[in-house]
Structure formats: structure tokens, C-alpha cells
């Protein structure tokens, strides 16, 4: 894992960001279960995937081969990429799945960037999936930055498949009705 992070940090610092570099590493090194990796699939479909490192919070950060400067640059590129994506989030949906600290802070910051750039964020819905309610997610994801916030408390192995089915059913019914609700 540390060698993957080392290589992806170095590659991602070159301009593509950490999420894209990790996805590329998974695909190019023919990792087991790459077919179910969100980072690998995002890379294959050219969909932005970002990784937001809080240095010192993961065991790979302590590995002597992982360069902090490269990791920092790669994750900074991802932060700017996410800010650009959120600038186009009007009438969209943000999912926070199981992150109680880092991603709520990142989301609040990129929303503020979008607003400071004059980007309209009307109609954004944020959904927080977690096992228990947390102050930071309730304030920084569901209340402060968006018009509509939904808290789904429960086990991910139950709620996420149910959410997926509900989303697919909604998309299918919209398609049948000739609407574009995507």
C-alpha cells in the first residue's frame, strides 16, 4: 500500500492529482478487484475522483518512501479539481458517506470558493450517510452550505444499496416519462 501511495503521490503531483493517479495505478498494475474500485472506474471513465489527505492520519504517511511534498501537491491538485466540480453543482447532489471530519471541512471550503467566485449553488441537496449523527456533518454539510440537507443514519451496508436502488428507480421512471432528472 505504501509503494502505491508513493508512486501515485509522485505521479499525481505532476498535474493529474492523487485520485486520478491512484486510479491509474490500480488499473495499470492490474490489481486484484480493480473492477470494483471506484478510483479505477472513475479513471477509466474520465470522471473526476479526488483524494483529500490529512497528513499523519494514515499509516502510509509514515513510510519513508512516501514524500510529503508530493503527497501534499497531489492532494492540493485534487482540492482545486473538487472546487471546480462544485462550481457546477447547482441543482445537484453532494453525498458525504461516513466522513465525520475531513470531508465536511473540505466540502464547506469548496462551497465557499464557488460562492466567492460568484457561482450559483441554488438547489443543491446534501445527503450525509453515517452510523450516528455528528455536529460537523450536520452543520458543515447539511445546514450551512446547502438549501436542503438529508441525514441518513444507519448501517452503510443497508442504506447504500437501498439508496442505489431508489436512485436507479427514479432515473428509470424519469426516462420513461421523458424527463431529464439526472
Locations of the language-model features?
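Short, conserved, surface-exposed binding loops centered on an aromatic residue
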Residues: 39-43, 83-88
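A general structural motif
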Residues: 31, 53-54, 69-87
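C-terminal functional extensions of proteins
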Residues: 84-85, 91, 100-182
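Active-site rim beta-loop-alpha module in soluble metabolic enzymes
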Residues: 46-64, 68
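General beta-strand structural signal in soluble alpha/beta enzymes
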Residues: 50-53, 95-96, 127-128
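Glycine- and other small-residue-rich loops at beta-strand/loop junctions that grip anionic moieties
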Residues: 27-28, 71-75, 95, 99, ...
